[in-house]
Amino acid sequence: MEQKEGKLSEDGTTVSPAADNPEMSGGGAPAEETKGTAGKAINEGPPTESGKQEKAPAEDGMSAELQGEANGLDEVKVESQREAGGKEDAEAELKKEDGEKEETTVGSQEMTGRKEETKSEPKEAEEKESTLASEKQKAEEKEAKPESGQKADANDRDKPEPKATVEEEDAKTASQEETGQRKECSTEPKEKATDEEAKAESQKAVVEDEAKAEPKEPDGKEEAKHGAKEEADAKEEAEDAEEAEPGSPSEEQEQDVEKEPEGGAGVIPSSPEEWPESPTGEGHNLSTDGLGPDCVASGQTSPSASESSPSDVPQSPPESPSSGEKKEKAPERRVSAPARPRGPRAQNRKAIVDKFGGAASGPTALFRNTKAAGAAIGGVKNMLLEWCRAMTKKYEHVDIQNFSSSWSSGMAFCALIHKFFPDAFDYAELDPAKRRHNFTLAFSTAEKLADCAQLLDVDDMVRLAVPDSKCVYTYIQELYRSLVQKGLVKTKKK
């Protein structure tokens, strides 16, 4: 009996001694009946004492196995927690190093982390499905093996009690489910660890990219410095141009510089060292304002190009803002170039004054507006009228009030000429009614003795009852000038 109880079936279960005793199975039923009902699940009748004894050690073995698996899972959890703690420390160090980074890099890291998580999720689902499928296949194979073994034993021997096999199968399936859940739990920290490793790698890649990008910053700083130098040079040139007066020698020199390229080959020096030096010792104070718009457009960046060589300033994409600023500043300089047309005019005026030996004299030079010129002319006209009145004050038939009706009889012309040439004719013999005789005598005597041109026609004066005031005024002015040249009229020297 003890050897029979110690025997194990193919699937690891103990075989009860009732299998050899056909009388014990089924409450004393014959062996043929037990063989006929071997494949059916028989729940009739209470279990025997040997069946109970077999159940107890089976349950004890299952509980021991479960406890061992639980201990193993606890150890796995502890190890996974340690690994997670080490990875968290690594993450903390990486976060400290990345604390000085910009928010844009953090955003990119989050995006990369999300992408990696989304990529890892379908992989995890596939792994879980594959593990579940393999577990199901193993369970089906295990279930098939005990069933086939039980059938073979039933053919040769009596079948063991069905309750024990059913409970054992239930316990196996439960343990398999628990192991599957624990495997899933164990895969979760592994997945987290892989996600954390992926994040750490992405952060390292970002750090390397930033470390590569950092050496480019000095280039941008150097370019900014060169741009500031160019702006300072432009401001100094503008201040020098404002300090120079319109008629100063430096301006004339600038004009000479403008004329030389226009008359010559038209070549503009590319650097300040090639510009001609001024005799006053100002050196390179020539500004771009003295040049034309085309010269400014072509040569405004030449000083900066000569200051910094291509080897000092490496070309990089950030150079575009500096070129944009230069393009924006160019219109301002172009606008200021044509705003200085006074230089040539002042020079031409000086040349005219030097050529004629002094400033222009006369009323036209004193008065520039029409009202002042008219007032001056009226003043001169009145002065000349007063002079004629004073010269003919003692003569009869003469009353000079204007340059028109007072000169209609011709007696005023004869009296004025007789004043300076009393021996030319006898004024007492003249008749105011003889107008033609009077005009002819006055104009001919003035032409002979005073060299005064005969600007008035005798026929015109006789035909007009009231002579034209402008014609009379012009003739009297010419007579006065002729008398001054003869020395007969004294003028006040200023």
From Swiss-Prot:
Residues 476-494 are annotated as: Calmodulin-binding. Residues 1-10, 74-104, 112-166, 179-232, 324-335 have a biased composition (Basic and acidic residues). It is found in: Cytoplasm, Myofibril; Cytoplasm, Myofibril, Sarcomere, I band; Cytoplasm, Myofibril, Sarcomere, M line; Nucleus. Expressed in striated muscles, specifically in type 2a fibers (at protein level). Residues 1-348 are annotated as: Disordered. Residues 378-484 form the Calponin-homology (CH) domain. One of its GO terms (molecular function) is tropomyosin binding. The modification Phosphoserine is found at S336. PROSITE patterns: CH. Plays a role in the regulation of contractile properties of both striated and smooth muscles. When unphosphorylated, may inhibit myosin dephosphorylation. Belongs to the smoothelin family. This is Smoothelin-like protein 1.
